[in-house]
């Protein structure tokens, strides 16, 4: 298999404030977390895991041949859960890169995962994350995050507001991160920062501490499921692609 020095970890906890038992919600006849895992697994990496605190989630994943790492339900963030899972991977001394894929993107494209792995390995960034160009109308309809970058694509700032102010085209941030191992270790050792707490965005802890995040353009905005309304959109999208035989 390719990229033997890379682990992909999908953090997934059962409890959710906005959508009850979110990972187990159905899209068609298949749960959200199974759809995420199936998409990620198509990237073809041996070290692909779901990190969870839930026997129910674990059962869903193991039934389709996936690997599960159990982590404590008290772990505060997805990145912390990713790191705790990484420490439990057998022979993890051979893993130099860790990709954190959020467990709420049921149609994430495997090509996007492979693209950020290649970009991370061929750059000097601590962390790499995907972005998509979107227009004002598209991003206004989204509750997600935009990013400002410099001419080389290095992230300058992430915000839940539209940045830069006054623009007609924006860079939408996709919730997936490729970490160098030492960068992930450093990140979890740092305390939450002012901007991170203000914007409620973990990646600002990275920038406030002088670490670097490179951005990698991908083509499509994946659907993220955080609310009941998001779930309805995901179900509708699935129904549409099913009719087309995709």
Curated annotation (Swiss-Prot):
GO terms for biological process: CMP-keto-3-deoxy-D-manno-octulosonic acid biosynthetic process; lipopolysaccharide biosynthetic process. Pathway: Nucleotide-sugar biosynthesis; CMP-3-deoxy-D-manno-octulosonate biosynthesis; CMP-3-deoxy-D-manno-octulosonate from 3-deoxy-D-manno-octulosonate and CTP: step 1/1; Bacterial outer membrane biogenesis; lipopolysaccharide biosynthesis. Keywords: Cytoplasm, Lipopolysaccharide biosynthesis, Nucleotidyltransferase, Transferase. One of its GO terms (cellular component) is cytosol. GO terms for molecular function: 3-deoxy-manno-octulosonate cytidylyltransferase activity. Its EC number is 2.7.7.38. Belongs to the KdsB family. Activates KDO (a required 8-carbon sugar) for incorporation into bacterial lipopolysaccharide in Gram-negative bacteria. NCBIfam families: kdsB (TIGR00466), PRK05450.1-1 (NF003948), PRK05450.1-5 (NF003952). This is 3-deoxy-manno-octulosonate cytidylyltransferase. It comes from Rickettsia africae (strain ESF-5).
């Amino acid at each position: 298999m390719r990229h033997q020095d890379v682990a992909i970890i999908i953090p997934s906890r059962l409890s959710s404030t906005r959508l009850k038992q979110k990972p187990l919600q159905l899209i068609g006849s298949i749960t959200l977390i199974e759809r995420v895992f199936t998409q990620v697994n198509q990237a073809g990496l041996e070290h692909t895991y779901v990190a969870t605190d839930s026997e129910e989630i674990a059962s869903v994943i193991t039934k389709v041949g996936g690997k599960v790492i159990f982590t404590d339900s008290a772990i505060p963030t997805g990145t912390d859960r990713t790191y705790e899972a990484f420490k439990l991977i057998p022979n993890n001394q051979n893993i130099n890169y860790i990709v954190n894929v959020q467990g709420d993107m049921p149609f994430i494209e495997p090509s996007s995962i492979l693209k950020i792995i290649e970009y991370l390995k061929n750059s000097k960034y601590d962390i790499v994350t995907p972005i998509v160009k979107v227009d004002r109308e598209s991003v206004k309809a989204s509750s997600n995050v935009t990013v400002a970058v410099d001419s080389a694509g290095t992230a300058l700032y992430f915000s839940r507001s539209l940045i830069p102010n006054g623009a007609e085209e924006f860079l939408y941030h996709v919730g997936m991160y490729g970490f160098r191992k030492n960068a992930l270790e450093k990140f979890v050792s740092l305390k939450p920062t002012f901007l991170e707490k203000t914007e409620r965005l973990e990646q600002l802890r990275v920038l406030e501490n002088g670490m670097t995040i490179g951005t990698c353009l991908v083509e499509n905005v994946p659907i993220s499921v955080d609310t009941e309304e998001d779930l309805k959109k995901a179900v509708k999208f699935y129904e549409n692609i099913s009719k087309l035989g995709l």
